[in-house]
A protein has these predicted regions:
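Vicinal oxygen chelate
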Residues: 4-13, 59-85, 88-165, 173-237
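Core segments of cupin and vicinal oxygen chelate
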Residues: 10-49, 159-176
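Short N-terminal helix-initiation segments at or just after the protein's N-terminus
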Residues: 5-16, 44-49, 88-93, 128-136
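Short, conserved helix/loop micro-motifs enriched in His/Cys and acidic residues
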Residues: 1
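Short regulatory "switch" loops immediately downstream of catalytic or recognition motifs
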Residues: 78-88, 168-173
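Conserved short beta-strand elements that form part of the metal-binding/catalytic scaffold
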Residues: 30-65, 70, 123-128, 192-198
Length: 237
Protein backbone atom coordinates (compact mmCIF):
# COMPACT_ATOMS: atom_id res chain seq x y z
CA UNK A 1 0.00 0.00 0.00
CA UNK A 2 1.01 3.63 -0.48
CA UNK A 3 -0.01 7.09 0.73
CA UNK A 4 0.00 6.15 4.41
CA UNK A 5 0.38 9.09 6.79
CA UNK A 6 2.12 9.08 10.16
CA UNK A 7 1.10 11.71 12.72
CA UNK A 8 3.24 12.14 15.86
CA UNK A 9 1.49 12.10 19.23
CA UNK A 10 3.43 14.25 21.69
CA UNK A 11 3.08 14.96 25.43
CA UNK A 12 2.42 18.31 27.09
CA UNK A 13 1.35 19.82 30.40
CA UNK A 14 -1.50 21.86 28.87
CA UNK A 15 -3.22 21.46 25.51
CA UNK A 16 -4.45 25.06 25.87
CA UNK A 17 -0.86 26.32 25.95
CA UNK A 18 -0.04 24.11 22.96
CA UNK A 19 -2.96 25.44 20.91
CA UNK A 20 -2.12 29.07 21.73
CA UNK A 21 1.51 28.61 20.68
CA UNK A 22 0.91 26.69 17.49
CA UNK A 23 -1.77 29.13 16.36
CA UNK A 24 1.02 31.74 16.39
CA UNK A 25 2.90 29.51 13.92
CA UNK A 26 -0.11 29.28 11.62
CA UNK A 27 -1.67 26.00 12.76
CA UNK A 28 -5.39 25.44 13.30
CA UNK A 29 -7.20 22.91 15.46
CA UNK A 30 -8.61 19.85 13.67
CA UNK A 31 -9.77 17.92 16.75
CA UNK A 32 -9.96 18.53 20.48
CA UNK A 33 -11.35 16.65 23.46
CA UNK A 34 -11.27 17.12 27.24
CA UNK A 35 -12.56 13.72 28.38
CA UNK A 36 -11.68 11.00 29.05
CA UNK A 37 -8.20 12.34 28.31
CA UNK A 38 -7.30 15.85 27.06
CA UNK A 39 -5.83 15.79 23.55
CA UNK A 40 -5.74 18.01 20.47
CA UNK A 41 -4.92 17.71 16.78
CA UNK A 42 -3.31 20.59 14.87
CA UNK A 43 -2.60 21.20 11.21
CA UNK A 44 -0.66 23.66 9.07
CA UNK A 45 -0.97 22.80 5.38
CA UNK A 46 0.38 19.21 5.13
CA UNK A 47 1.96 19.29 8.60
CA UNK A 48 -0.08 17.41 11.24
CA UNK A 49 0.72 17.19 14.95
CA UNK A 50 -1.26 15.75 17.87
CA UNK A 51 -0.73 16.28 21.59
CA UNK A 52 -1.96 14.66 24.78
CA UNK A 53 -2.02 16.31 28.21
CA UNK A 54 -0.37 14.74 31.26
CA UNK A 55 -1.11 16.18 34.71
CA UNK A 56 2.07 17.40 36.38
CA UNK A 57 4.15 16.93 33.23
CA UNK A 58 7.49 18.80 33.28
CA UNK A 59 8.42 20.11 29.79
CA UNK A 60 12.07 20.36 30.84
CA UNK A 61 12.13 16.56 31.20
CA UNK A 62 10.43 15.84 27.87
CA UNK A 63 11.96 13.48 25.33
CA UNK A 64 9.20 14.25 22.81
CA UNK A 65 10.51 14.90 19.31
CA UNK A 66 9.67 14.42 15.64
CA UNK A 67 11.14 15.14 12.21
CA UNK A 68 9.59 17.43 9.60
CA UNK A 69 11.05 17.25 6.08
CA UNK A 70 10.51 20.24 3.80
CA UNK A 71 11.85 21.51 0.49
CA UNK A 72 12.64 24.94 1.97
CA UNK A 73 13.60 25.26 5.63
CA UNK A 74 14.20 28.99 5.21
CA UNK A 75 10.68 29.67 3.98
CA UNK A 76 9.09 27.74 6.85
CA UNK A 77 11.39 29.40 9.38
CA UNK A 78 10.49 32.86 8.07
CA UNK A 79 6.77 32.07 8.32
CA UNK A 80 7.15 30.88 11.92
CA UNK A 81 9.36 33.87 12.80
CA UNK A 82 6.82 36.31 11.32
CA UNK A 83 4.10 34.76 13.48
CA UNK A 84 6.25 35.11 16.59
CA UNK A 85 7.08 38.73 15.83
CA UNK A 86 3.40 39.53 15.32
CA UNK A 87 2.35 37.81 18.56
CA UNK A 88 5.30 38.47 20.87
CA UNK A 89 7.16 41.35 19.24
CA UNK A 90 10.24 39.16 18.81
CA UNK A 91 11.46 35.73 17.78
CA UNK A 92 11.64 33.48 20.84
CA UNK A 93 15.24 32.31 21.19
CA UNK A 94 15.47 31.34 24.87
CA UNK A 95 13.38 29.49 27.41
CA UNK A 96 10.42 27.31 26.49
CA UNK A 97 8.97 27.75 23.92
CA UNK A 98 11.70 28.91 21.53
CA UNK A 99 13.06 28.37 18.01
CA UNK A 100 16.55 27.89 16.61
CA UNK A 101 17.64 29.29 13.24
CA UNK A 102 18.20 27.28 10.04
CA UNK A 103 21.80 26.11 9.90
CA UNK A 104 23.72 23.45 8.02
CA UNK A 105 23.94 20.35 10.21
CA UNK A 106 27.21 18.44 10.27
CA UNK A 107 25.34 15.41 11.61
CA UNK A 108 22.76 15.55 8.78
CA UNK A 109 25.12 15.49 5.79
CA UNK A 110 25.28 19.29 5.73
CA UNK A 111 21.54 19.74 5.13
CA UNK A 112 19.87 22.79 6.64
CA UNK A 113 17.74 22.40 9.74
CA UNK A 114 16.12 24.25 12.62
CA UNK A 115 14.06 23.25 15.66
CA UNK A 116 10.93 24.50 17.36
CA UNK A 117 10.86 23.70 21.07
CA UNK A 118 7.20 23.98 22.02
CA UNK A 119 5.51 24.59 25.42
CA UNK A 120 5.51 20.84 26.03
CA UNK A 121 9.29 20.69 25.65
CA UNK A 122 8.92 18.75 22.39
CA UNK A 123 11.60 19.30 19.74
CA UNK A 124 10.00 19.67 16.31
CA UNK A 125 13.08 19.17 14.12
CA UNK A 126 12.69 20.69 10.66
CA UNK A 127 15.14 19.47 8.02
CA UNK A 128 15.78 20.16 4.37
CA UNK A 129 14.55 17.33 2.17
CA UNK A 130 17.52 15.15 1.20
CA UNK A 131 16.78 15.69 -2.50
CA UNK A 132 18.27 19.17 -2.11
CA UNK A 133 22.06 19.52 -2.42
CA UNK A 134 23.66 20.01 1.02
CA UNK A 135 25.87 22.93 1.91
CA UNK A 136 29.62 22.60 1.44
CA UNK A 137 31.56 21.29 4.42
CA UNK A 138 32.89 24.14 6.57
CA UNK A 139 36.51 25.16 6.17
CA UNK A 140 38.76 27.02 8.59
CA UNK A 141 38.92 26.57 12.32
CA UNK A 142 36.00 28.93 13.05
CA UNK A 143 33.73 27.23 10.54
CA UNK A 144 34.55 23.82 11.95
CA UNK A 145 34.01 25.03 15.52
CA UNK A 146 30.65 26.47 14.48
CA UNK A 147 29.62 23.16 12.90
CA UNK A 148 30.54 21.23 16.04
CA UNK A 149 28.72 23.70 18.29
CA UNK A 150 25.55 23.50 16.19
CA UNK A 151 25.48 19.73 16.64
CA UNK A 152 25.74 20.16 20.41
CA UNK A 153 23.23 22.98 20.95
CA UNK A 154 20.75 22.68 18.09
CA UNK A 155 20.69 18.88 17.81
CA UNK A 156 21.58 17.50 21.25
CA UNK A 157 20.26 20.44 23.25
CA UNK A 158 23.58 20.77 25.10
CA UNK A 159 24.08 24.53 25.01
CA UNK A 160 26.83 24.43 27.65
CA UNK A 161 29.04 22.19 25.53
CA UNK A 162 28.37 24.42 22.51
CA UNK A 163 29.45 27.43 24.57
CA UNK A 164 32.70 25.70 25.52
CA UNK A 165 33.46 24.90 21.87
CA UNK A 166 32.78 28.46 20.73
CA UNK A 167 34.65 30.06 23.62
CA UNK A 168 37.70 27.94 22.85
CA UNK A 169 37.62 29.04 19.21
CA UNK A 170 37.11 32.70 20.08
CA UNK A 171 39.85 32.56 22.70
CA UNK A 172 42.53 31.69 20.14
CA UNK A 173 42.24 34.23 17.31
CA UNK A 174 44.26 33.67 14.15
CA UNK A 175 45.28 36.19 11.50
CA UNK A 176 43.91 33.82 8.85
CA UNK A 177 40.41 33.77 10.37
CA UNK A 178 37.60 34.61 7.94
CA UNK A 179 35.88 37.74 9.34
CA UNK A 180 32.51 36.49 8.08
CA UNK A 181 32.99 33.26 10.02
CA UNK A 182 33.95 35.35 13.05
CA UNK A 183 30.67 37.27 12.83
CA UNK A 184 28.73 34.02 12.51
CA UNK A 185 30.47 32.50 15.53
CA UNK A 186 29.94 35.61 17.66
CA UNK A 187 26.25 35.76 16.78
CA UNK A 188 25.76 32.08 17.50
CA UNK A 189 27.62 32.42 20.81
CA UNK A 190 25.18 35.21 21.70
CA UNK A 191 22.25 32.93 20.89
CA UNK A 192 23.71 30.12 22.97
CA UNK A 193 24.21 32.56 25.85
CA UNK A 194 20.53 33.46 25.73
CA UNK A 195 19.54 29.79 25.84
CA UNK A 196 21.74 29.56 28.96
CA UNK A 197 20.01 32.61 30.48
CA UNK A 198 23.24 34.62 30.27
CA UNK A 199 22.19 37.98 28.78
CA UNK A 200 25.46 39.69 29.78
CA UNK A 201 27.47 37.39 27.52
CA UNK A 202 24.92 37.76 24.73
CA UNK A 203 25.24 41.55 24.90
CA UNK A 204 29.04 41.29 24.92
CA UNK A 205 29.06 39.05 21.83
CA UNK A 206 26.71 41.32 19.88
CA UNK A 207 28.91 44.30 20.76
CA UNK A 208 31.91 42.41 19.38
CA UNK A 209 29.97 41.77 16.16
CA UNK A 210 29.65 45.53 15.67
CA UNK A 211 33.43 45.89 15.90
CA UNK A 212 34.23 43.40 13.12
CA UNK A 213 35.18 45.29 9.94
CA UNK A 214 33.77 43.74 6.76
CA UNK A 215 33.99 44.68 3.11
CA UNK A 216 30.76 45.14 1.15
CA UNK A 217 31.07 41.62 -0.27
CA UNK A 218 31.75 40.15 3.16
CA UNK A 219 28.79 42.01 4.64
CA UNK A 220 26.57 40.43 1.99
CA UNK A 221 27.87 36.99 2.91
CA UNK A 222 27.17 37.72 6.57
CA UNK A 223 23.60 38.95 5.94
CA UNK A 224 21.94 35.98 7.64
CA UNK A 225 24.14 36.40 10.71
CA UNK A 226 23.31 40.10 10.92
CA UNK A 227 19.61 39.27 10.65
CA UNK A 228 20.02 36.83 13.52
CA UNK A 229 21.84 39.49 15.53
CA UNK A 230 18.91 41.86 15.02
CA UNK A 231 16.48 39.24 16.34
CA UNK A 232 18.72 38.57 19.34
CA UNK A 233 18.98 42.28 20.15
CA UNK A 234 15.19 42.56 20.00
CA UNK A 235 14.82 39.59 22.33
CA UNK A 236 17.24 41.21 24.80
CA UNK A 237 15.40 44.54 24.88
Amino acid sequence: MTNEVTVPLLPCASIDDIVAFYEVLGFHTTYQQRKPNPCVGLQREDLHLQFFEIAGFDPAQSYGSCLVLTSDTGQLYRAFAAGMRAAYGKVLVSGTPRMTRPRARKNADGLSGFSVIDPGGNWIRVFQNASVSPASAPTGRLGKAMANAVVQADSRGDARQAARILDSALGHPDTDDDPVALVEVLVYRAEVAMVLNDPATAIEMLARVDRVALSADQATRAAAAYEAATDLAAALS
